[in-house]
Amino acid sequence: MNLKQLAGEYAANFVNDGMKIGLGTGSTVYWTIQKLGERVKEGLSFQAVPTSKETEALAQQLNIPLISLNDVQSLDLTIDGADEIDSNLQLIKGGGGALLREKIVASSSKKLIIIADESKLVTHLGTFPLPIEIIPFSWKQTENKIQSLGCQTTLRLKNNETYITDNNNMIIDCIFPNHISNPVHLHTQLKMITGVVETGLFISMTSTAIIGTKNGIKKL
């Protein structure tokens, strides 16, 4: 069993009968969803809000009951992955392109459980490119303003074409040469730029991190 599978399957144990949960997106959450599909076959009853079309399709294949976030006041918990996790449980997310929906669902949840393998633990955020979702209109102007904060930017592509999110937006991936020293301040600066929809910085949102390590599960 690989470390992503270890963390992903373990997190499925947090889901109990009657819960309303958020299901994240990515290669680690894939294992959570697979395990939850097995538990549905065994009789577990819960409802889930998917954070992407990819997750929605997988959940439907496994007969996991899906609901809209519009139909609930809050979710009991959300299980999602991360691209980087620092010692304060601040995150970079969005490598899979679903950061906006992931953040909306996470912010509507009583608990956010982050799952990852130990390679995602970092001292400072910023080695992994920070994704920023922007609207397509005048995207180059928005990119220039983002660059003025001191980062190198790349417009995300897929199959040599501009990557389009599930919300019909674009993603700019940003590298900060000296890492991200103050994630809270940077998030605020980015959100003040007109054209920026959301950032991949998840600040003070994580309740628990479940890390798959060579020595087993580690909880943060």
Curated annotation (Swiss-Prot):
InterPro entries (UniProt xref): NagB/RpiA_transferase-like, Ribose5P_isomerase_typA_subgr, Ribose5P_isomerase_type_A
Record-annotated active site: E102
EC number: 5.3.1.6
Pfam families hit by this protein: Rib_5-P_isom_A (PF06026)
Catalytic function, reaction form: aldehydo-D-ribose 5-phosphate = D-ribulose 5-phosphate
Pathway(s) per entry: Carbohydrate degradation; pentose phosphate pathway; D-ribose 5-phosphate from D-ribulose 5-phosphate (non-oxidative stage): step 1/1
Keyword match S-adenosyl-L-methionine: no
Name of the top EC class for this enzyme: isomerase
Keyword Transit peptide: no
Keywords: Isomerase
Residues noted as binding substrate in the record, renumbered to the chain: T25, G26, S27, T28, D80, G81, A82, D83, K93, G94, G95, G96, K120
Biological process per Gene Ontology, one example term: pentose-phosphate shunt, non-oxidative branch
GO molecular function, one term: ribose-5-phosphate isomerase activity
Function comment: Catalyzes the reversible conversion of ribose-5-phosphate to ribulose 5-phosphate.
PANTHER family: RIBOSE-5-PHOSPHATE ISOMERASE
Complexes and interactors: Homodimer.
Similarity comment: Belongs to the ribose 5-phosphate isomerase family.
Name of this protein: Ribose-5-phosphate isomerase A
Organism for this UniProt entry: Bacillus cereus (strain ATCC 14579 / DSM 31 / CCUG 7414 / JCM 2152 / NBRC 15305 / NCIMB 9373 / NCTC 2599 / NRRL B-3711)
